[in-house]
Amino acid sequence: MHSELKNVSKHLAELGAGILAQAQKNALYTGYYSHLDEGVLGVMQAAQAAELLIKAAIAKQHPLLIFSSVPKSTSVSGELLSMQDIFEDGKTIQYAELPEKLWATTGYKLPNQDVYKSFGKLRNTIQHFALPKRDVRAETARFIYAVVDPLMGHFWDDYAVNYVDVVEAKDDIFELLSNYGIKPRYPEELKDFAESVE
């Protein structure tokens, strides 16, 4: 394996967590002077964050497992497959196929796959067609805490509540989630904030 490929999992996990922080900001908080409901952006970002985090978990096994096709040895420029070769001729696994690939490579069965599939359809509807008449903020929050948070717990011993791109989010994140009927997992250092809502 080319040395460039060794940090793929770490890169995808960091990128996914960063996008998750933006997704939660847009899904749970309301900004000002926006012509578009930020909740719509939260849908797009949460789906992308999930996709990246699942790929990061798969890539821990081997980075090429996130690809459905890779360049052939006759089409690469050097002795080993490089990142440039993959950028030009590789194709990654699609969103809908990721839960099965995750299970096949790691043995981990993504929880709430019905939520995962439904949320993928919601993302596609927004991206390709129109804005649905649904509470996209609530659906995004449920998706994050039913699908993404357990994934983070299993592979990184981490929590989705740690990734909200708002200063001092810990002060109100649990109340905001409670409004959607969500009681998230949380690290010990957030126990007092979480229990103040119960």
Regions found by a protein language model. Name each.
Residues 59-119:
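A broadly used, surface-exposed interaction patch
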